């Protein structure tokens, strides 16, 4: 009986820790780019809890990243891993696969601003295992 309780408690703790590590995305604005037919600009903030990270993904968009708080680690497929601090920037192109996106700290949160130029109505993030639309 004690072993079952211990297993349940451990599972709850592990699940809570995994859930706490998911990135929090806050949409700030979206605007049709009337002089670029079919495109829109989107602005979001992303917050990583301590130790938080993203799954491997792509944006199928131009993504301009600006670090606001903390320190983040980014890497694109075929590129080098970089650590960014407040005031530093990062760019992802429509064909890039984002293989590393995480908080560099296990004790402090991190927050960054992302401005995307993307196809109107397309999702902001596409998991890497989904095909890129033609």
Regions found by a protein language model. Give the residues of each.
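A short, N-terminal "cap"/entry segment at the start of jelly-roll beta-barrel domains
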Residues: 2-42, 75, 91, 109, ...
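Extracellular/periplasmic catalytic domains that process cell-envelope and extracellular macromolecules
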Residues: 38, 58, 66, 83, ...
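Short acidic-glycine-tyrosine-enriched beta hairpin
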Residues: 33, 37, 48, 78-95
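Short structured motifs
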Residues: 27-31, 85, 98-100
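Histidine-centered metal-chelating micro-motifs
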Residues: 53-55, 73, 90, 94-103
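Short, conserved beta-strand element in jelly-roll/cupin
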Residues: 62-74
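Ligand-binding loop in jelly-roll beta-barrel domains
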Residues: 81, 96-122
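N-terminal targeting signals for Sec/Tat export/insertion, comprising classic cleavable signal peptides
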Residues: 29-62
């Amino acid at each position: 009986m004690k072993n079952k309780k211990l297993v349940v408690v451990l599972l709850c703790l592990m699940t809570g820790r995994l859930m706490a590590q998911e990135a929090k995305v806050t949409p700030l604005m979206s605007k049709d780019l009337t002089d670029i037919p079919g495109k829109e600009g989107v602005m979001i903030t992303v917050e990583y809890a301590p130790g938080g990270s993203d799954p491997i993904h792509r944006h199928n968009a131009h993504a301009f990243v600006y670090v606001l708080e903390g320190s983040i680690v980014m890497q694109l497929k075929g590129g080098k891993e970089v650590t960014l601090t407040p005031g530093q920037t990062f760019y992802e192109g429509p064909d890039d696969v984002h293989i590393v996106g995480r908080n560099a700290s296990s004790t402090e949160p991190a927050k960054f601003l992302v401005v995307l130029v993307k196809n109107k109505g397309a999702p902001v993030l596409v998991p890497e295992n989904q095909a890129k639309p033609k």
